[in-house]
Swiss-Prot record:
ATP binds at residues 30-37, 147-150, 184-187. This is Pantothenate synthetase. The gene is panC. GO terms for molecular function: ATP binding; pantoate-beta-alanine ligase activity. Beta-alanine binds at Q61. It catalyses: (R)-pantoate + beta-alanine + ATP = (R)-pantothenate + AMP + diphosphate + H(+). InterPro entries: Pantoate_ligase (IPR003721), Pantoate_ligase_C (IPR042176), Rossmann-like_a/b/a_fold (IPR014729). It comes from Rhizorhabdus wittichii (strain DSM 6014 / CCUG 31198 / JCM 15750 / NBRC 105917 / EY 4224 / RW1).
């Protein structure tokens, strides 16, 4: 696996990859990789793709009081993991390459970005949309793979790709979880051993709510029960627990089509997010 750090080298190497005729896939990441990221590479390889992975800790998607400086950076270990997973190319630009002096453009996606994490983290999705658009322009992939754990992010990306007529297939890959159900996340490393035990309450509370709603139970009651369980376990604040339309992310109060149960809450100093598909019980 090659590692490239400037745009000219990236474009030359991607052009070489295209000679084989195989599709080129992009897996955007911020590093601190885990099995969830490997699953994205695996999904791309299963489609017969040459796999380009980007690692860039994007400052424009962090708020002023968030964890930009603390976010884990371990490129050597990440590169070894990607090499073992079969990635073809690692694109690892620095901040000056991505945001050179005079950079003045931001992409704002209305609607789907405005609630939930968009409300809790002002400016976050503009940063995401801008950097992902740049990565798309730099790599020009045929397909891009994103984890469903960041479900609102995936919805935002699908929205601007459709709105801007970007000819890239967007593939969502199911959330990868630890044995106790906690969604894999680079930020799980922030949890103390005690918090890590408590954190499993989040997927369990969501699972119970999803099952209740799927059985035809009252949506408001199921959401209230999940919030109460999280509060009792020590999550504070609880930003949201909501049942939403899977495409628009607008809140819904009954199952009429594809739906998602989404949640975000803080445990100690760590903000955790998760989501589950909700379907009517057979």
């Amino acid at each position: 696996m090659q590692i490239v750090r400037n745009i000219d080298d990236l474009r030359q190497e991607v052009a070489k990859l295209r000679i084989s005729g195989a599709p080129v896939a992009l897996v955007p990441t911020m590093g601190a990789l885990h099995r969830g990221h490997v699953a994205l590479v695996d999904a791309a390889r299963s489609r017969g793709c040459e796999v380009v992975v980007s690692i860039f800790v994007n400052p424009t998607q962090f708020g002023p009081s968030e964890d930009l400086d603390a976010y884990p950076r371990r490129e050597a270990a990440d590169a070894a993991m990607l090499d073992g997973a079969g990635a073809t190319l690692l694109w690892a630009p620095d901040v000056a390459t991505m945001y050179p002096p005079g950079f003045a453009t931001s992409i704002s996606v209305g609607g789907v970005s405005e609630r939930w994490d968009g409300a809790a983290r002002p400016g976050h999705f503009a940063g995401v949309a801008t950097v992902v658009t740049k990565l798309f322009q730099q790599v020009k992939p045929d397909i891009a793979f994103f984890g469903e754990k960041d479900f609102q992010q995936l919805a935002v990306i699908r929205r601007f790709v459709a709105d801007l007529d970007i000819d890239i297939e967007i593939v969502g890959v199911p959330t990868q979880r630890d044995d106790d159900g906690l969604a894999l996340s680079s930020r799980n490393a922030y949890l103390s051993p005690e918090e890590r035990v408590t954190a499993r309450t989040l997927p369990r509370a969501l699972g119970e709510a999803a099952a209740a709603i799927g059985r035809g139970g009252d949506v408001a009651a199921a959401l209230a029960a999940a919030i109460a369980r999280l509060a009792e376990a020590g999550f504070d604040p609880i930003d949201y627990v909501a049942l939403v339309d899977a495409a628009s992310l607008e809140p819904i109060d009954r199952l009429d089509g594809p739906a998602r149960l989404i949640a975000a809450a803080r445990l100690g100093g760590t903000r955790l997010i998760d989501n589950l598909a909700v379907e009517p019980a057979p």
